[in-house]
């Protein structure tokens, strides 16, 4: 098979072939690409699309399994899985796939629209209405911001930043553009800029709930807990009975050290949504920090009872350090770790909890295997590269020379006080 000299050009040709219905040509291109680079994500994705249209369901599933293994948070892989399962009549599986697709990439209009149809068929009117509203929201975005959202959630953050900045130069007060650029800044660790953008956007559109939720998150990341709690209070004043707002108010109260208020509001959420696993886990965290360990254990275990795949609940139990898993719990965690439809981060959390369970039993080989699996799974979602870090170090060495510092002699603060650098967990 002839090697592909320009993979990007070949992918564009494959995409054009798919769009024109020439799946044979598209298949030839993707086969050639994968022969030279079996882990090429876009080639695997297009190969799966071709296989679905050509009726080669087993091949499509194989390509998607490989793609999800390489990139567990690649939303389009789950969207394609949803299309395939829907075609095969597995409507429940299709719903699960489309739900994961929108979780990993909320810009996928096709997934939202498919969910709206499938929810409607199942008689779930509220969920159908929400999914349709989400599809309409994405559709209404300027095309540039649709692209920004897609780039963000497929890991191309710098490309997303370029488009967002260019858009805001033309539309400087577009609050969704400001929100997306703040999201990019937060992902890149530039929290101060993100805070300024969101504060400005909230001033422009104070009734925009998503803006304020993002603002709260950035304030928390900057450890401005009182300010985050104040913003959560604004949402609570707007709709005191809204469980989403109650949950955020509880979380910010916990961060601010007011555990009684936090626990009270977690209970209010659970009264409206009994057995909500995320709230049970959050309540467990609050109880643990408050020193009420036995109640924390009960809350975590309640979460695993209603949602056995809730990985952070199992991890919460393990992270207590003093909790010992029973044999039945070990078996349940092993079953969930092997389940096909579990979220990726839940699988990561369960792997580490399994490591703790095996370690407590003295089965060190099994413990090391579980820890290794957890680290390998986590590594799949980490886009860190040593090349990037080396480039940053080289740039610092090139710019920050002895001459640079000598030229700045005499500047700075003359105070002799020692400087303590805080906020570096495990730095020692």
Residues of each region from the PLM?
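Helix-start (N-cap) detector for alpha-helical repeat units in TPR-like alpha-solenoids
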Residues: 7, 23, 41-42, 75-79, ...
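Register position in tetratricopeptide repeats
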Residues: 19-20, 53, 87, 121, ...
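TPR-repeat structural position
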Residues: 23, 57, 91, 125, ...
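Structural marker of alpha-solenoid helical repeat scaffolds
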Residues: 36, 53, 69-70, 104, ...
């Amino acid at each position: 098979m002839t090697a592909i000299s320009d993979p990007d050009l070949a992918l564009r040709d494959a995409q054009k072939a798919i769009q024109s219905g020439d799946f044979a040509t598209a298949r030839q291109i993707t086969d050639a690409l994968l022969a030279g680079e079996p882990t090429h994500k876009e080639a695997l994705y297009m190969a799966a699309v071709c296989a679905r249209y050509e009726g080669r369901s087993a091949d499509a599933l194989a390509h998607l399994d490989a793609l999800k293994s390489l990139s567990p948070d690649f939303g389009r892989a789950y969207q394609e899985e949803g299309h395939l399962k829907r075609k095969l009549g597995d409507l429940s599986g299709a719903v699960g796939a489309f739900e994961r697709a929108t979780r990993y990439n909320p810009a996928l209009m096709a997934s939202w629209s498919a969910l709206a149809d499938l929810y409607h068929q199942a008689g779930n009117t509220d969920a159908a209405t929400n999914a349709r509203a989400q599809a309409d929201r994405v559709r209404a975005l300027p095309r540039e911001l649709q692209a920004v959202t897609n780039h963000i959630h497929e890991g191309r953050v710098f490309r997303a930043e370029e488009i967002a900045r260019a858009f805001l130069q033309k539309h400087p007060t577009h609050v969704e553009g400001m929100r997306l650029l703040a999201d990019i800044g937060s992902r890149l660790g530039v929290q101060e800029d993100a805070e300024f953008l969101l504060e400005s956007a909230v001033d422009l559109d104070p009734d925009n709930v998503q803006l304020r939720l993002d603002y709260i998150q950035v304030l928390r990341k900057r450890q401005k807990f009182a300010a985050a709690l104040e913003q959560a209070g604004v949402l609570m004043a707007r709709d005191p009975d809204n469980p989403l707002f109650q949950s955020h108010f509880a979380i910010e109260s916990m961060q601010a050290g007011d555990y009684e208020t936090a626990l009270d509001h977690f209970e209010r959420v659970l009264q409206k949504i009994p057995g909500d696993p995320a709230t049970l886990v959050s309540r467990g965290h609050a109880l643990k920090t408050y020193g009420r360990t036995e109640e924390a254990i009960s809350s975590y275990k309640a979460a695993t009872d209603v949602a056995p795949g809730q990985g952070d609940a199992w991890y919460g139990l393990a992270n207590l350090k003093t909790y010992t898993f029973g044999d039945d719990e070990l078996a349940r965690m092993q079953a969930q770790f092997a389940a096909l439809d579990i979220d990726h981060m839940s699988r990561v959390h369960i792997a580490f909890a399994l490591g703790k369970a095996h370690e407590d039993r003295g089965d060190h080989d099994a413990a090391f295997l579980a820890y290794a699996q957890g680290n390998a799974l986590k590594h799949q979602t980490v886009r860190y590269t040593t090349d990037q870090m080396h480039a940053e170090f080289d740039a610092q060495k090139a710019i920050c020379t002895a001459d640079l510092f000598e030229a700045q002699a005499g500047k700075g603060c003359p105070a002799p006080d020692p400087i303590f650098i805080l906020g570096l967990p495990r730095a020692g």
